[in-house]
């Protein structure tokens, strides 16, 4: 997937089997509270919540495509029973990830752009299906539709 090269964070569902084990000594209390609070909501409530909530676990993953150290968060907009319950997030190109990144001040790196021009001060995710690759190393200048 062309987007994953510039994933700036990862999110697990609060009920994911690894969620609690990813907490560090510094984040354990907040992580445990978040897991508990999320367990009190139904999946319907979680998907309808207008405001994104989450907690940083204190742990990181390594992005296999870029080698970048990627922070791991928990958020109840990810559900354990949908897919794997874990997602790599490219907030420049997904509305929910964009809202989450804006709220928690997580970097947003655009990787697909119309006519190869990066949007300055993004106010929403760029969700067009195709465009020119930017901020993507060897893929810069390539059309996303051929990757």
For every predicted segment, state its role.
Residues 7, 12-13, 64, 72-75, ...:
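Generic beta-strand/beta-sheet core signal
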Residues 59-98:
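Catalytic-site beta-strand/loop segments enriched in glycine and acidic/polar residues
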Residues 7, 12-16, 25-28, 105-121:
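Basic, alpha-helical terminal appendages of large translation-related enzymes
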Residues 13, 17, 50-51, 74, ...:
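Residue-level signal for pocket-adjacent positions within structured domains
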Residues 7-8, 56-58:
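Short glycine-rich loop/turn motifs
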Residues 2-6:
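Conserved small/polar residues in nucleotide/adenosyl-binding loops
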Residues 13-56:
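Amphipathic alpha-helical
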């Amino acid at each position: 997937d062309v987007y994953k090269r510039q994933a700036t964070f990862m999110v697990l569902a609060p009920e994911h089997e690894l969620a609690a084990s990813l907490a560090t000594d510094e984040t354990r209390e907040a992580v445990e509270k978040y897991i508990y609070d999320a367990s009190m909501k139904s999946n319907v409530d979680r998907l309808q919540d207008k405001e994104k909530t989450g907690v940083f676990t204190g742990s990181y993953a390594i992005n296999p495509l870029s080698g970048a150290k990627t922070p791991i968060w928990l958020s109840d907009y990810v559900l354990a029973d949908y897919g794997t319950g874990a997602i790599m997030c490219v907030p420049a190109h997904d509305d929910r990830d964009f809202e989450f990144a804006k709220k928690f001040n997580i970097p947003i790196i655009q990787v697909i752009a119309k006519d190869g021009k990066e949007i300055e001060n993004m106010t929403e995710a760029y969700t067009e299906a195709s465009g020119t690759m930017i901020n993507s190393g060897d893929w810069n200048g390539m059309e996303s539709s051929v990757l």
